[in-house]
Protein backbone atom coordinates (compact mmCIF):
# COMPACT_ATOMS: atom_id res chain seq x y z
CA UNK A 1 0.00 0.00 0.00
CA UNK A 2 1.04 3.57 -0.62
CA UNK A 3 1.05 4.59 3.02
CA UNK A 4 3.50 1.83 3.99
CA UNK A 5 6.31 3.26 1.84
CA UNK A 6 5.62 6.84 2.93
CA UNK A 7 5.41 5.84 6.59
CA UNK A 8 8.71 3.96 6.27
CA UNK A 9 10.32 6.96 4.58
CA UNK A 10 9.20 9.25 7.43
CA UNK A 11 10.66 6.85 10.02
CA UNK A 12 14.01 6.76 8.19
CA UNK A 13 14.02 10.55 7.70
CA UNK A 14 13.44 11.29 11.39
CA UNK A 15 16.05 8.68 12.36
CA UNK A 16 18.59 10.34 10.04
CA UNK A 17 17.68 13.76 11.48
CA UNK A 18 18.47 12.70 15.07
CA UNK A 19 21.45 10.41 14.37
CA UNK A 20 24.01 13.13 15.15
CA UNK A 21 22.53 13.29 18.67
CA UNK A 22 23.69 9.72 19.27
CA UNK A 23 20.27 8.68 20.63
CA UNK A 24 19.78 5.58 22.72
CA UNK A 25 18.02 2.69 20.99
CA UNK A 26 15.02 3.37 23.23
CA UNK A 27 14.86 7.05 22.18
CA UNK A 28 15.19 6.09 18.53
CA UNK A 29 12.48 3.41 18.77
CA UNK A 30 10.13 5.75 20.68
CA UNK A 31 10.47 8.56 18.15
CA UNK A 32 10.14 6.27 15.13
CA UNK A 33 7.03 4.64 16.61
CA UNK A 34 5.37 8.00 17.33
CA UNK A 35 6.22 9.29 13.84
CA UNK A 36 4.93 6.07 12.28
CA UNK A 37 1.57 6.46 14.03
CA UNK A 38 1.25 10.17 13.19
CA UNK A 39 2.22 9.76 9.53
CA UNK A 40 0.06 6.67 8.99
CA UNK A 41 -2.97 8.47 10.44
CA UNK A 42 -2.23 11.59 8.39
CA UNK A 43 -1.94 9.56 5.19
CA UNK A 44 -5.10 7.54 5.78
CA UNK A 45 -7.17 10.55 6.82
CA UNK A 46 -5.29 13.11 4.70
CA UNK A 47 -6.44 11.35 1.57
CA UNK A 48 -10.04 11.28 2.74
CA UNK A 49 -10.54 14.92 1.84
CA UNK A 50 -10.38 13.82 -1.78
CA UNK A 51 -13.16 11.23 -1.63
CA UNK A 52 -16.18 10.96 -3.86
CA UNK A 53 -14.57 9.18 -6.75
CA UNK A 54 -15.89 5.88 -8.06
CA UNK A 55 -14.84 3.22 -10.53
CA UNK A 56 -17.33 0.81 -12.12
CA UNK A 57 -19.98 1.93 -9.63
CA UNK A 58 -17.73 0.99 -6.71
CA UNK A 59 -16.36 3.65 -4.39
CA UNK A 60 -12.59 4.03 -4.51
CA UNK A 61 -11.01 4.36 -1.05
CA UNK A 62 -9.96 7.97 -0.57
CA UNK A 63 -6.53 6.90 0.66
CA UNK A 64 -5.79 5.24 -2.67
CA UNK A 65 -3.10 6.27 -5.12
CA UNK A 66 -5.66 7.85 -7.46
CA UNK A 67 -5.78 11.30 -5.81
CA UNK A 68 -3.17 11.58 -3.07
CA UNK A 69 -3.23 14.37 -0.51
CA UNK A 70 -0.27 16.16 1.04
CA UNK A 71 1.25 15.14 4.33
CA UNK A 72 4.13 17.18 5.72
CA UNK A 73 6.64 16.43 8.45
CA UNK A 74 8.70 19.22 10.00
CA UNK A 75 11.46 18.46 12.53
CA UNK A 76 13.35 21.00 14.63
CA UNK A 77 15.92 20.60 17.38
CA UNK A 78 16.14 23.48 19.85
CA UNK A 79 18.72 22.76 22.51
CA UNK A 80 17.86 19.29 23.75
CA UNK A 81 14.18 19.43 22.70
CA UNK A 82 13.13 17.65 19.51
CA UNK A 83 9.96 19.00 17.90
CA UNK A 84 8.14 17.02 15.21
CA UNK A 85 5.07 18.35 13.43
CA UNK A 86 2.93 16.26 11.06
CA UNK A 87 0.18 18.00 9.07
CA UNK A 88 -2.37 16.90 6.51
CA UNK A 89 -5.13 18.56 4.50
CA UNK A 90 -7.59 15.78 5.19
CA UNK A 91 -11.15 15.88 6.36
CA UNK A 92 -10.13 16.88 9.89
CA UNK A 93 -11.36 15.36 13.11
CA UNK A 94 -14.94 16.11 14.17
CA UNK A 95 -14.58 15.00 17.80
CA UNK A 96 -10.93 15.30 18.81
CA UNK A 97 -11.55 14.24 22.41
CA UNK A 98 -13.24 11.02 21.22
CA UNK A 99 -10.54 10.39 18.59
CA UNK A 100 -7.85 10.52 21.28
CA UNK A 101 -9.52 7.81 23.37
CA UNK A 102 -7.61 4.50 23.27
CA UNK A 103 -9.19 1.91 20.94
CA UNK A 104 -11.33 4.47 19.08
CA UNK A 105 -11.03 4.02 15.31
CA UNK A 106 -12.96 5.24 12.29
CA UNK A 107 -11.26 2.60 10.12
CA UNK A 108 -12.06 -0.87 11.52
CA UNK A 109 -12.08 -2.20 7.94
CA UNK A 110 -8.36 -1.36 7.73
CA UNK A 111 -7.79 -3.24 10.98
CA UNK A 112 -6.68 -0.05 12.72
CA UNK A 113 -6.26 -0.52 16.47
CA UNK A 114 -7.32 2.95 17.56
CA UNK A 115 -4.12 3.30 19.60
CA UNK A 116 -2.29 5.89 17.46
CA UNK A 117 -2.72 8.88 19.76
CA UNK A 118 -2.13 6.69 22.85
CA UNK A 119 1.19 5.52 21.37
CA UNK A 120 2.19 9.09 20.49
CA UNK A 121 1.43 10.20 24.05
CA UNK A 122 3.28 7.23 25.56
CA UNK A 123 6.45 7.53 23.46
CA UNK A 124 6.84 11.31 23.34
CA UNK A 125 7.10 13.82 26.20
CA UNK A 126 4.32 16.07 24.96
CA UNK A 127 1.62 15.93 22.29
CA UNK A 128 -0.61 18.64 20.89
CA UNK A 129 -3.28 17.96 18.27
CA UNK A 130 -5.27 20.60 16.41
CA UNK A 131 -7.86 19.76 13.81
CA UNK A 132 -10.40 21.66 11.75
CA UNK A 133 -13.15 19.67 10.03
CA UNK A 134 -12.80 20.03 6.27
CA UNK A 135 -9.29 21.51 6.55
CA UNK A 136 -7.01 18.91 8.11
CA UNK A 137 -5.05 18.01 11.21
CA UNK A 138 -1.79 19.11 12.84
CA UNK A 139 0.00 16.76 15.26
CA UNK A 140 2.87 18.36 17.19
CA UNK A 141 5.09 16.13 19.36
CA UNK A 142 8.08 16.93 21.55
CA UNK A 143 10.78 14.77 23.11
CA UNK A 144 13.62 15.85 25.37
CA UNK A 145 16.78 14.26 24.02
CA UNK A 146 19.66 12.93 26.06
CA UNK A 147 22.16 15.23 24.35
CA UNK A 148 25.19 14.70 26.56
CA UNK A 149 27.37 13.16 23.87
CA UNK A 150 26.34 14.48 20.47
CA UNK A 151 28.39 13.16 17.61
CA UNK A 152 30.42 16.13 16.38
CA UNK A 153 29.50 18.29 19.40
CA UNK A 154 32.16 20.90 20.13
CA UNK A 155 33.52 20.82 23.69
Language model regions located:
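Conserved short strand/loop->alpha-helix "switch" segment adjacent to the catalytic nucleotide/phosphoryl-transfer site
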Residues: 12-37
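Conserved beta-strand-loop-beta-strand hairpin that lines the nucleotide-binding pocket
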Residues: 42-155
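Conserved strand-to-helix beginnings and helix N-cap segments that scaffold or border functional pockets
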Residues: 11-12, 97
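Short, small-residue-biased leader/transition segments that mark boundaries at the very start
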Residues: 1-2
